[in-house]
Amino acid sequence: MTNYHFTGIKGSGMSALAQILHDLNENVQGSDIEETIFTQKPLERKGITLLPFSRDNIKNGQHVIVSAAYGETHEEIKRARELGLKVDVYPEFLGSFIKQFTSIAVSGSHGKTSTTGLLAHVLGSVEPTSYLIGDGTGKGAANSTYFVFEACEYRRHFLNYSPDYCVMTNIDFDHPDYFKSVEDVVSAFQTMAKQVNKAIIACGDDEHLQTLQANVPIVYYGLGDHNDFQAKSIKNTPEGTAFDAWVRGDLFGSFVIPGFGDHNVKNALSVIALCHYEGIGYEDIVEHLKTFAGVKRRFSEKRSGKQILIDDYAHHPTEIAATIEATKKKYHDREVTAIFQPHTFTRTKTFLNEFAEALSQADHVYLCDIFGSAREEQGSLSIEQLQALVDGAKLLTEAEIETLKGHGESVLLFMGAGDIQKYQKAYEALIESSS
């Protein structure tokens, strides 16, 4: 049994990995900032000790795993070096850890978390499966056949992995604080493709993924006729979305998923393709696709009086457009009111016009102040510059949250990767106190 200490345990990947090792009967503790973050709840439920950052947390006999957000200057890492302890950065540790399983990385600019969750759900219903999801959820199953994990392209972290399979959902220009252009992103995915050992499952509707070269088979999925796995006859139903899956021109079968929007159909199709490649039966895939309950902060819904409140992690124009589209398909008889908090000044500046175009698909738009990341506390851009590009957009603060009550039976769509949840919580508290 190993004694693990996680420096930065509340990060989504770190939290999930800590849960996995705990499930596998290792001793796990961790430290982080004292602010409450949604990823810590599952840690607390499992009885994993959470500490504030301190060099005193580091003891002899520990194996220290450090978040990629922290470097050698962190007080805990300095102490670990003084004691001569084994220290691994999260992506490096994960890259080594996955070698004991049939490993399946899920990568892509958008849709990673939802696809990882869906694939883990389907595989885990058929075979022992461990998984690490980007919403902070992790599970370690004894004697696992599969390990499904989210592999992020940021700073090329996913190049620490050489998985058996890699699902690639799409390539888009994001993380402009690191990537220079979409070509730079493509280059990272091309390098990743060369590291895959068995097969790549890639969205063939994405022009960038069509250019991939690899030493293993590439199985393409999507809505276009050129794909190996194609979705046809897509229809909205009371249960979600129904579609037929065709494999190289032959009907494989009909499926229903709880989600809405073409992006969710494609995510499901990638899971179907992977399962088909692994020899998992049609009936198992059908049964477990339709029972997927979703992942945290991805189209998470609740009712509040006559309104529908949705919390979503969307923080890139492509994701915002897809989330608004899915909302309109599911709630076609309601107005959609978007409440958006931009995440990082760099991303907001880079995609200012694209954000405006995506948000304009909503019936009403409210904008919250830009959330700066730990890497950039402030920037020269103001939220008013985005407001000027979106007709009728209004600014929103927590103190003015009561304004949302004026939207009757609207769907209130809270979107962002920062702390947009505090606005929704403030609104829910207001509704509860006035009921």
Curated annotation (Swiss-Prot):
Family: Belongs to the MurCDEF family.
GO biological process: cell division; cell wall organization; peptidoglycan biosynthetic process; regulation of cell shape
Presence of the UniProt keyword Cytoplasm in the record: yes
PANTHER family: UDP-N-ACETYLMURAMATE--L-ALANINE LIGASE, UDP-N-ACETYLMURAMATE--L-ALANINE LIGASE-RELATED
One Gene Ontology term of the molecular function aspect: UDP-N-acetylmuramate-L-alanine ligase activity
Enzymatic reactions: UDP-N-acetyl-alpha-D-muramate + L-alanine + ATP = UDP-N-acetyl-alpha-D-muramoyl-L-alanine + ADP + phosphate + H(+)
Name of the protein in question: UDP-N-acetylmuramate--L-alanine ligase
Top-rank lineage group of the source organism: Bacteria
Known EC number: 6.3.2.8
Pathway: Cell wall biogenesis; peptidoglycan biosynthesis
Described purpose of this protein according to its UniProt entry: Cell wall formation.
Binding site for ATP: 108-114
One of the Pfam families matching this protein, by short name: Mur_ligase_C
Organism: Shouchella clausii (strain KSM-K16) (Alkalihalobacillus clausii)
Keywords: ATP-binding, Cell cycle, Cell division, Cell shape, Cell wall biogenesis/degradation, Cytoplasm, Ligase, Nucleotide-binding, Peptidoglycan synthesis
Cited SUPFAM superfamilies: MurCD N-terminal domain, MurD-like peptide ligases, catalytic domain, MurD-like peptide ligases, peptide-binding domain
Cellular component per GO, a single term: cytoplasm
Cellular location(s): Cytoplasm
